[in-house]
Amino acid sequence: MLYLIGLGLGDAKDITVKGLEVVRRCSRVYLEAYTSVLTVGKEALEEFYGRKLILADREEVEQEADNIFKDADVSDVAFLVVGDPFGATTHSDLILRATKLGIPYQVIHNASIMNAVGCCGLQLYRFGETVSIVFWTDTWRPESFFDKVKRNRANGMHTLCLLDIKVKEQSLENLIRGRKIYEPPRYMSVNQAAQQLLEIVQNHRARGEEPAITEETLCVGLARVGAEDQKIAAGTLQQMCTVSLGEPLHSLVITGGNLHPLEMEMLSLFSIPESQSTDGL
């Protein structure tokens, strides 16, 4: 049996009781290490679970999954995912491949940012389509996701923005030369996401288009949701460029405009103090 087990968002103890029981009896336990990260390292997980973990990076999962499936038809193999197993399409692909190989599977769910984002006080049923914001490069500066933000805003829906994670990525030069040399991990911050969004706003204005959001649009920055030191900050998009939320992982919410009074009251708990605002806001 192949088990896909969600680990939740905080630390080693966020795994469910059912998930922990399965981990402790499996012959092999893989830890997916590229779509998200916990606030604790692999060693802390191993100590709490009482098991050695095999790190599974993007290449292992997407190109060499046969190693994961090996003997899963006659023994139990666990694949651990930060958050919920269905937080990334890669994990659906694992299930499809397992099914084609005749390997039975079971999913053990947990909290993910997709539902835990409600901790900021915005009502989950008022969220529209989720978007991803990636690191821009000198030659690649995608803006297509902004159309989804526009549609959500038109419908009065909030937009959860998942921010880019670069783990075990290769530079273009090393990729072309076939050198397995990897760049240091990078995690997009709320500040970086807000700065890119403001540039998109300026680009729309330069083209004579009315942008879906402005510098004054109310947003919410979230960091390390589910951890003991999670941080939440509510303020304008301009303020998101400078607010200090600390270590990763970060997420950003662009509000849908008209807020429910309860949402407004909840967001007031996380308002950025005037002392943290930059001049001219």
UniProtKB/Swiss-Prot annotation:
UniProt cross-references to CDD domains, sorted A to Z: DHP5_DphB
Effect after changing H260R: Most homozygous embryos are non-viable and show craniofacial, ophthalmologic, cardiac, visceral, and hemopoietic abnormalities
GO molecular function: diphthine methyl ester synthase activity; diphthine synthase activity
GO cellular component, one term: cytosol
Enzyme class: transferase
EC number in record: 2.1.1.314
Catalytic activity: 2-[(3S)-amino-3-carboxypropyl]-L-histidyl-[translation elongation factor 2] + 4 S-adenosyl-L-methionine = diphthine methyl ester-[translation elongation factor 2] + 4 S-adenosyl-L-homocysteine + 3 H(+)
Binding locations of S-adenosyl-L-methionine: L9, D84, G87, S112, I113, L163, V225, H250
Highest taxon in the source lineage: Eukaryota
Keywords noted in UniProt: Methyltransferase, Phosphoprotein, S-adenosyl-L-methionine, Transferase
Pathway in which the depicted protein is active: Protein modification; peptidyl-diphthamide biosynthesis
One BP term from GO: protein histidyl modification to diphthamide
InterPro entries: 4pyrrol_Mease, 4pyrrol_Methylase_sf, 4pyrrole_Mease_sub1, 4pyrrole_Mease_sub2, Dphthn_synthase
NCBIfam families (alphabetical): dph5 (TIGR00522)
Function: S-adenosyl-L-methionine-dependent methyltransferase that catalyzes four methylations of the modified target histidine residue in translation elongation factor 2 (EF-2), to form an intermediate called diphthine methyl ester. The four successive methylation reactions represent the second step of diphthamide biosynthesis.
Family: Belongs to the diphthine synthase family.
Identification of the protein by name: Diphthine methyl ester synthase
Protein source organism: Mus musculus (Mouse)
